[in-house]
């Protein structure tokens, strides 16, 4: 059976006078092969009492499994994002069921932005931009330009980057969900 796939998830961290503003967004398109089966899926959400932003790309059922496991790690480690991500990837690499999951997570809190890969790696990009999914490279290029050459806020950059990705990537649509942290 074919997997549900294709999406764009982007998180942007922008320096503000008060610290950092963080936003994450994703499109709503879910495809099965070459057919769009849903256009308004919610692939980003707030976790751990609204203090952590997370989004997924990949097989939907696998992503929900990872969300649940990641949220359990956040609870266990009192919301410490990096520690929870590392502990999740330790499990991911040693658990036979988790090793077969085909999904990636983009996660962020007030201090860090991370990519948790399907290989069980934790990556922290240097520029505060995290992208995953089929339209990720397009959204990343747009966000880099907007972050470096405009005064747009993090949520504005996320929105515009998703719009640009949707114009290029056939697996990304214009139905967006955006979540923010102050």
From Swiss-Prot:
It catalyses: ATP-dependent cleavage of peptide bonds with broad specificity. GO terms for molecular function: metal ion binding; threonine-type endopeptidase activity. The active site is at 7. Keywords: Allosteric enzyme, Cytoplasm, Hydrolase, Metal-binding, Protease, Sodium, Threonine protease. Protease subunit of a proteasome-like degradation complex believed to be a general protein degrading machinery. Belongs to the peptidase T1B family. HslV subfamily. This is ATP-dependent protease subunit HslV. The gene is hslV.
